[in-house]
Amino acid sequence: MSIFERKYNFMSYLEWFETHANKHRVIVQKLSTQNYTKEMIIDYFLFENMVEKEPEFCLLYAKKQKCHNLQALNCYLCACPHFRFNDEGLSVEEGINYKSECSIHSKKSSYFVYEKVSHLDCSACSVPHTKAYIRKHFDVDWKKIMQKCFVTSPKA
C-alpha cells in the first residue's frame, strides 16, 4: 500500500474487491428471496434506484454522484471484468509500479500516477455499465463474473 493510500485510509484493491463482493452478495440474496428475476435484479441496480434503496453500496451515492457519465448507468457490475489488478504490482516500467490495467486495452481508459504507483482510470469507459453487457455476462455471483480481475502471477 502506498503512502497516499495509507494517508487517506484507502483499501487495497483486494480488500475493496472482497468487501464489494460481500455487499453485492447481500443485495442479490435479498432480491432472490423476493423472487426477483434476472431482469428485475439488473433493473434494481440502476443508479437512481440504488441511491435511494442501497445508499451504503457506494460512497458516491451520498452525493448522488455517478462514477461514469451515462444516462442509464447500471451499477450491477460496478467494477469491470476487464480490470486486472495486483496490489504488489503487475509490472514496473521506468520506475513506475503498475497495479492495474485494462485487459482489452480500452482507448477510453487512462492512467494516473501518484508516488511512482500507476492506477487505471476507467471513468471514461462505459463497457460494464450497460444493461446489454450485464445481461450477456450475468451471474448472481459477482465474483464469478469478476474472477479474472485479481492477477496472482504478475508479469516479470
Language-model features, listed with the residues they occupy:
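Cysteine-centered metal-binding/redox modules
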Residues: S2-A156
